[in-house]
Regions:
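Short pre-active-site segment immediately N-terminal to the catalytic Zn-binding motif
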Residues: 25-44
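Short, solvent-exposed coil/turn segments at beta-strand boundaries
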Residues: 4, 22-25
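Metalloprotease/metallohydrolase-associated module, dominated by Zn2+-dependent proteases
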Residues: 1-15, 61-126
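A mature extracytoplasmic/lumenal domain signature
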Residues: 11-13, 32-34, 57
Length: 126
């Protein structure tokens, strides 16, 4: 939120999804049901990756971060991408899924936020 994004713990405007990031509205939604499902941290990190991907230009573009994934996770990510996303979104989604799958996902996303989304001097006073 320090970087101008709003984070909402409510159902995303699109049905059937657990999280959503809208770079035009600078808003992240995380569905409350993700807490009961035990996937809230992963969902939040995934959507936070999309916010970071949009920091510089306002449009989501891959950061170029390619963490190592074991074969099973890599195949699961690929199958999810193939079934649920258009090919033009694969790069940004693959990166978000890869980062959310890391055991150090929380410090990792915090570092990426600091690196790619610095607080502008005029925002620090707010």
């Amino acid at each position: 939120e320090q970087r101008g994004w709003t984070v909402l713990l409510q159902a995303p405007p699109r049905k059937g999804i657990y999280g959503m990031a809208n770079s035009k509205k600078k808003t992240i939604w995380v569905h409350p049901i993700t807490e009961a499902m035990g996937i809230m941290p992963q969902t939040f990190v995934h959507e936070a990756v999309h916010a970071v991907q949009a920091c510089k230009t306002g449009k989501m573009k891959p950061l170029g971060y390619k963490p190592a994934l074991d074969y099973v996770v890599d195949r699961a990510v690929f199958n999810n991408l193939y079934r649920n996303y258009t090919s033009r979104k694969w790069a940004i989604e693959k990166e978000a899924f890869a980062i959310q799958a890391q055991p150090n996902r929380i410090p990792l996303i915090m570092g990426l936020i600091v690196e790619h989304c610095p607080i502008k001097p005029d925002e620090q006073a707010a």
